[in-house]
Amino acid sequence: MMSFVISDEFLGTFVPILVYWVYSGMYICLGSLDKYRLHSKIDEDEKNLVSKSAVVKGVLLQQTLQAIISVILFKITGSDADAATTQQFSILLLARQFIIAMLVIDTWQYFIHRYMHLNKFLYKHIHSQHHRLIVPYSYGALYNHPLEGLLLDTIGGALSFLFSGMSPRTAIFFFSFATIKTVDDHCGLWLPGNPFHIFFSNNSAYHDVHHQLYGTKYNFSQPFFVMWDRILGTYLPYSLEKRANGGFETRPIKVSKDE
């Protein structure tokens, strides 16, 4: 009797895509959650410059391109059998590979992301597509121009995979974790007890600052740490203020002091 085996390469390619829609769908199922929103529902509907149907189509296009490149990358770097013979699982090895991958992808994305803001042509024709979402929401996290998706996410992910030396099996967990983190950073909510808000300075409020007009030259770091913003002077501190009609609002510290 023939058995059907799903390879780690297949799972490493498609599990993060499934995780993206499941995790962002969870936020949709939670409802409006007005008292935890960083922007009102009215602002979300009125300020964003792209329809939600266009966002879904854009994300699906990017994920299709990522899947194709992931399959090619896994084919080039070897099979499950090769990985199994060269790596023995240990928590220490897993932690080391995760940390290296996080640092690599953060470094790559910071400098590419910042350059897309500095270069007027790239911003106008490519990166501005992501900034059509002035009020971010969960499933808009990967709404980008296809070329930006290739440069920022796909190549960044490939480099983190290669430099960390992780196996396809480890990649399943790392890229699923990175996907959850990215979706959470764009969820537009400040939920009590959210572990990403507790353990990471780079979170939904931090990234929300970057999506506002006053913050487009700051807070480029994504998706894990804020080190490059701090080192290179693009870190914009902010305060989280309660709105009178419910929810929260991010305000740059400089503006808060002047008021």
From Swiss-Prot:
A single MF term (Gene Ontology): iron ion binding
Short sequence motif named Histidine box-3, residue ranges: 206-212
Subcellular compartments: Endoplasmic reticulum membrane
Short sequence motif Histidine box-2: positions: 127-131
Main location: endoplasmic reticulum
Cellular component aspect of the GO annotation: endoplasmic reticulum; endoplasmic reticulum membrane; Golgi apparatus
Catalytic activity: a dihydroceramide + 2 Fe(II)-[cytochrome b5] + O2 + 2 H(+) = a phytoceramide + 2 Fe(III)-[cytochrome b5] + H2O
Effect of loss of the gene: No visible phenotype; due to the redundancy with SBH1. Sbh1 and sbh2 double mutants are severely dwarfed, do not progress from vegetative to reproductive growth and have enhanced expression of programmed cell death associated-genes.
Domain statement: The histidine box domains may contain the active site and/or be involved in metal ion binding.
Family: Belongs to the sterol desaturase family.
Protein name, per record: Sphinganine C4-monooxygenase 2
Organism lineage string: Eukaryota, Viridiplantae, Streptophyta, Embryophyta, Tracheophyta
Gene assigned in the entry: SBH2
